[in-house]
């Protein structure tokens, strides 16, 4: 899940319309490496600016792919990867780690768009005012189905359980927070937090990354079978994605407009909020001191260790070897060293 940057509160029908849209990138003739199916974690908003640049500028076909299909969520991508209906899923370390730990799912993370995850418990200062994990006690928290394992991980990492509060099943419309149905709402710092604040409310965030769960997110997640059978295609995909996200980092507002005017044109996205969300993700989530040194999507040994430790604190028992296979990305940068210089 991600949030709806600029999606008007009360826009559940907009979400429903996007969920029925099952294709995104256009396929071109040719392409020795075939077509890849990509499951997005959320709707086609600015969160996927890099993918939109890669598609619209022809980076996927330039890399040798016949095309890439972008299927909107919400989804963790686990079911799609295991069923074979997706070759790549934009997911997160908790969702993939949980599947590996609990189901022995043969999945791997091969890179991460977000060096820092943007999940938060969003509240309104004059209502829920959830500023610390202790503030969750006794509160009603709206949790979407795709975020159940994430919220359970947050509770476990902070010594809490669901019996300490009330979990309210919700969809992705933050109006339930505004109207008082819930005190807190699982959201993205770059999306719903902006949306609700834009409505004039003073918002309070409880970021997962600052409260026991500093895991990577918007991860490029694949099956071990895909790594074995489609390695060259996945590497080509990563090359195109690096180029796309280089553009998104250097011109976040243009990336936002690709969502507003093209890929998400039927969603009613708010231009100002979309630009703000795209800028925040470009400056605070996608890049870091480590990406400057190692390149976009890389996950340093330190960040791997922090991710594994955060999962362990939430009761998810996996090793770095279980969760990550960064050899494809290593090969991409070794073969294309010019891609390191994303900050043009």
Please place each PLM-identified region on the residue numbering:
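Short, glycine-/small- and polar/acidic-enriched structural segments
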Residues: 6, 27-169, 175-179, 183-187, ...
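Extracytoplasmic/periplasmic substrate-binding proteins
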Residues: 193, 197-216
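Bacterial lipoprotein signal-peptidase II cleavage site
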Residues: 14-30
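Short, solvent-exposed loop/beta-turn-alpha elements that line the ligand-binding surface or hinge
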Residues: 59-64, 132, 210-213, 228, ...
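Conserved C-terminal helix/tail region of periplasmic/extracytoplasmic solute-binding proteins
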Residues: 302-344
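N-terminal export signals
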Residues: 1-17
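A bilobed periplasmic-binding-protein/Venus flytrap-type ligand-binding module shared by bacterial periplasmic
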Residues: 120-130, 216-232
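Secondary-structure end/capping motifs
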Residues: 230-314
